[in-house]
């Protein structure tokens, strides 16, 4: 029987689990929240954080999976690509490409290096880094979280004094 590992256990995984079962596929859900709804419908559950790619890889190898995916669960996409590449499984793309596409800063850098027009943007790890670049931008600006899963945390900043607020 084929085995599919689904990263994440939220309700969004339910249609995938149902479709896999209809095809006779054994489904393993994986995340660190044992009460997530999808685990009740999968055949097996792994209590592992989906962003810990090495632990997910270890579990995937031990379970001898035939496929891995992260459906409607952005944090697991990079891990799914990593595991698929390490195990020679089909995937949406190479690990390096997926890493670029899942990180806004890396994606903008890729676009710029390849001649695409992109808005002026910078990536910062903390408030003090952002404050060093206040002269680079024309105010007001838009602040957004780097992780695609947090994209709804966009904020309009009218002046540089609001940077600490935006970085919360």
Predicted segments with their positions:
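Active-site nucleotide/adenylate-binding loops and adjacent lid/helix of ATP-dependent enzymes
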Residues: 102-168
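ATP-binding N-terminal substructure of ATP-dependent carboxylate-amine bond-forming enzymes
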Residues: 1-97, 128
């Amino acid at each position: 029987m084929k085995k599919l590992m689904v990263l994440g256990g939220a309700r969004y995984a339910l249609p995938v689990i149902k479709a896999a079962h209809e095809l006779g596929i054994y489904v393993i859900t994986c995340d660190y929240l044992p009460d997530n709804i999808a685990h009740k419908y999968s055949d097996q559950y792994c209590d592992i954080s989906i962003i810990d790619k090495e632990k997910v890889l270890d579990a995937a190898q031990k379970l001898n999976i035939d496929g891995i995916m992260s459906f409607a669960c952005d944090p697991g996409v990079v891990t799914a690509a990593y595991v698929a590449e390490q195990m020679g499984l089909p995937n949406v793309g190479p690990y390096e490409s997926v890493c670029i596409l899942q990180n806004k800063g890396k994606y903008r850098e890729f676009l710029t290096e390849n001649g695409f027009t992109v808005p002026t943007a910078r990536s910062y790890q903390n408030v003090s880094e952002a404050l060093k670049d206040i002269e680079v931008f024309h105010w007001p600006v838009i602040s957004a979280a780097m992780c695609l899963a947090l994209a709804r945390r966009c904020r309009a900043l009218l002046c540089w004094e609001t940077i600490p607020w935006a970085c919360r």
